[in-house]
C-alpha cells in the first residue's frame, strides 16, 4: 500500500493585523444623539417589582384566580 505525498503546510499564524485608521476628532454634537436627554433607556429597566405593563397585570390577576402567591 503506497502513501500519496501530502502537500507541505506552511506555518499558519493568526492573522491579527488590522488596518490602522487616522484618528478623527469629531465635534461632540456629531457624536451624541440629539435627544435632549442623556439617558438612553428607562431608569427602571431592571426593576422586577414595577409590574405596570399589561402582561404583568394580567399575570397577577391570573395568579390570584389560581390562588398562587406571587413573589
Swiss-Prot record:
Region (UBS-I): 38-49
Biased composition (Acidic residues): 11-22
InterPro entries: DSS1_SEM1 (IPR007834)
Listed GO CC annotations: cytoplasm; cytosol; nucleus; proteasome complex; proteasome regulatory particle, lid subcomplex
SMART domains: DSS1_SEM1
Recorded name of the encoding gene: rpn15
Domain notes: Two unstructured ubiquitin-binding sites (UBSs) mediate interaction with ubiquitin. UBS-I is the strong and UBS-II the weak binding site.
Self-association state and partner proteins as the record states: Interacts with mlo3, rae1, nup98/nup189 and nup146. Interacts with rad24. Interacts (via UBSs) with ubiquitin (ubi3/ubi5).
Protein name: 26S proteasome complex subunit rpn15
Organism whose genome encodes this protein: Schizosaccharomyces pombe (strain 972 / ATCC 24843)
Region of interest: Disordered: 1-38
Family stated for the protein in its record: Belongs to the DSS1/SEM1 family.
Job description of the protein: Versatile protein that might stabilize multiple protein complexes involved in diverse pathways. Subunit of the 26S proteasome which plays a role in ubiquitin-dependent proteolysis. Acts as a ubiquitin receptor of the 26S proteasome, by interacting with ubiquitin chains linked by 'Lys-63' and 'Lys-48'. Involved in nuclear export of specific sets of mRNAs. Links the mRNA adapter mlo3 to rae1 for targeting mRNA-protein complex to the proteins of the nucleoporin complex (NPC). Involved in recombinational repair of DNA.
Keywords: Cytoplasm, mRNA transport, Nucleus, Transport
Any Gene Ontology biological process: double-strand break repair via homologous recombination
Region (UBS-II): 16-25
Keyword Transport attached: yes
PANTHER family for the chain: 26 PROTEASOME COMPLEX SUBUNIT DSS1, 26S PROTEASOME COMPLEX SUBUNIT SEM1
Main location: cytoplasm
GO molecular function: molecular adaptor activity
Keyword Mitochondrion: no
Subcellular location: Cytoplasm; Nucleus
Amino acid at each position: 500500500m503506497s502513501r500519496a505525498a501530502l502537500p507541505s503546510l506552511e506555518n499558519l499564524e493568526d492573522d491579527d493585523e488590522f488596518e490602522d485608521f487616522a484618528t478623527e476628532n469629531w465635534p461632540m454634537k456629531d457624536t451624541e444623539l440629539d435627544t435632549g436627554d442623556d439617558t438612553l433607556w428607562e431608569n427602571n429597566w431592571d426593576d422586577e417589582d414595577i409590574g405596570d405593563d399589561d402582561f404583568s397585570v394580567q399575570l397577577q390577576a391570573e395568579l390570584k384566580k389560581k390562588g398562587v402567591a406571587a413573589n
